[in-house]
Every structure is written in structure tokens, then in C-alpha cells.
């Protein structure tokens, strides 16, 4: 095993200028991530300098077998925390050979919204709180839970410490450091209310970069759980009953909201979101109806309301924002399996266009 470990951690820069680029894309389910690697002649820092590539879309549920080629367009580069050195992770979106975005390519439409002059002028910031659950590999039951049974009731686990309360911290901290190494603007982590469930936060990030960073942070987490022999679940309600679900609360502000008088801008934006509540819910993740029940710090899926410091609301405004008269708000509706390109661009579109 030591020889294998040595080879995995081999420093290529001693013998070659070539680097490895891991191309990453969203798969056919719209939630799964796929990747493959290629050798490049030297370091690259600009995604526009990277070659386009292709893959077999019939094997990912994204193209028919008789016309299976899907083209990868590199969009964002991050440092590779696994191979290190000058090696990179490349977030791509996906197109037909004719250059048309395929249905699972949600980045293309989002980029159009974020490049609109009215949106650019407002410099939209996003901070996404990604909740997730770690499952035992062979039985798909949360780590730290007794086989075929349940732990004690919720209460001691949120931000908890100790072997009987916090399960999987080694994975969480490994992910935290790997994201920082990669150049992702990860801003924190914490244990969640349900044991075996955790959260990391990405942001504040501007516009389309929020989606790029969250997808790559998910990819890194998937790779780390793969190494650890643990299953990563983004199911919004992995365990039925009196247990919290998993969301992706999305914090949002614009330049006008962050400036003096921004609280009035925030209230008008929330009013706009309320008018399109059903459209947003339809785009905020699969299975969200199992999570948005009006219990466990959620609003009922069929209602829309906002409140200050209210974690049972659809939209929460913080006490500091109310006090200072400017700041941001939190959309608490998105599910843990949401597509960040869809959610962030939809919030920007509804509030700014």
C-alpha cells in the first residue's frame, strides 16, 4: 500500500511540464457528476485556452446511441487537491456537436441572465448553504446510526462535538481544506440537526461563479466520500419521520440591497419572489415536497411568507439586516439536490429583470 500511496502522490513537476486536467460535468439525472482526465502540454489558467472535449452521452443518459457524442466546453478552472501541483479541475458545460446546449446544461441559460446589463450592474452575491447526509455504504443508513435502529432524538447534534454526537468530521474537514486549496470560496462548515448530516457554505460569490463553485465543491466531496467508502446523499428528506431534511438555503443580495435604503429594495424583491412562488418551487429540486412540510425549520410548500429571524419562513431576513436597513435575505426553499445554476439565475431574473 505504501508504494501505491507514493505513486498517487507522485510529484510530476520534477520530471515533466505536462499536467492532468480533470474535466467535470453534470450527468443525465441533473444531480450526478461525471468526470474524466486528459494530459495537457503545460499549465493552463484560462478556461478559454483549454481544448473542448467529448464523451459518450448515451452512457450518461444525455444522448441516443446512434448519435452519442456530447461536447464539453471548459468554463472554470480550479486547482486539483487530489493530484496537486499544476494539475487542475475543470468545470464544463455540455453541448451537441452543432453547439446547442443539451437539456441538462443549465449553465448556458444562467450565463445569459448573469450577463444581462441590468444584472451585471447590480453585482448579485450568493451564499449557498449545502446540506448533505453521509450514509453507510452497504445499507444506505446514516453513519453513526445503529444498524436497523435510530439514535436519540434531535437536539444534541447540531454543531455538536463528541463521538456520540458528531459522525464523519474527518470527511468534513478534509473537504473544507480541499475546497480552500482548490480556490473555492468556501466560507464554513457545521454539523446539522440530524445526526450524520452536515453543511458547508460557498460564497459570497458573484453571479455564475456561485454555481461553478458549488458544483465543484460537490464534486470534491463526492471524491472524498468515495475514498472514505461512504455514500454522499443529497436527498432532501433522506429519513422519513421526525428528522430534519436537507436543503440548500440560498442567501442573496444586490448592490442596491447592500447600500443605504437597501431594506426597502429587499422587501420589494421578496414580493416579486412571492408572485412566482410556484415556478420557483418547481425548479428548486426533486422531492422537495417531502421536506417543505411546515415542520423541521421549513415553510409549507404551498405557502409563501417571509419573516425576520424566522427559520420557519419561505424567506428569512436576518436581524442585522433589519437593524442596519440594508444587507441580504435567505431563500430557504431550495432542496439539497437543487441545481445552483437554476436557483441563482432564477432569483436574479425574478428580482432584477
UniProtKB/Swiss-Prot annotation:
<comment type="subunit">
    <text>Homooctamer.</text>
</comment>
<feature type="domain" description="GS catalytic">
    <location>
        <begin position="106"/>
        <end position="353"/>
    </location>
</feature>
<keyword id="KW-0067">ATP-binding</keyword>
<keyword id="KW-0547">Nucleotide-binding</keyword>
<dbReference type="InterPro" id="IPR008146">
    <property type="entry name" value="Gln_synth_cat_dom"/>
</dbReference>
<dbReference type="GO" id="GO:0004356">
    <property type="term" value="F:glutamine synthetase activity"/>
</dbReference>
<dbReference type="InterPro" id="IPR050292">
    <property type="entry name" value="Glutamine_Synthetase"/>
</dbReference>
<dbReference type="InterPro" id="IPR014746">
    <property type="entry name" value="Gln_synth/guanido_kin_cat_dom"/>
</dbReference>
<comment type="similarity">
    <text>Belongs to the glutamine synthetase family.</text>
</comment>
<keyword id="KW-0963">Cytoplasm</keyword>
<feature type="domain" description="GS beta-grasp">
    <location>
        <begin position="19"/>
        <end position="99"/>
    </location>
</feature>
<dbReference type="GO" id="GO:0005524">
    <property type="term" value="F:ATP binding"/>
</dbReference>
<keyword id="KW-0535">Nitrogen fixation</keyword>
<protein>
    <recommendedName>
        <fullName>Glutamine synthetase nodule isozyme</fullName>
        <ecNumber>6.3.1.2</ecNumber>
    </recommendedName>
</protein>
<dbReference type="GO" id="GO:0006542">
    <property type="term" value="P:glutamine biosynthetic process"/>
</dbReference>
<dbReference type="InterPro" id="IPR008147">
    <property type="entry name" value="Gln_synt_N"/>
</dbReference>
<dbReference type="Pfam" id="PF00120">
    <property type="entry name" value="Gln-synt_C"/>
</dbReference>
<dbReference type="GO" id="GO:0005737">
    <property type="term" value="C:cytoplasm"/>
</dbReference>
<dbReference type="InterPro" id="IPR036651">
    <property type="entry name" value="Gln_synt_N_sf"/>
</dbReference>
<dbReference type="InterPro" id="IPR027302">
    <property type="entry name" value="Gln_synth_N_conserv_site"/>
</dbReference>
<keyword id="KW-0436">Ligase</keyword>
<dbReference type="InterPro" id="IPR027303">
    <property type="entry name" value="Gln_synth_gly_rich_site"/>
</dbReference>
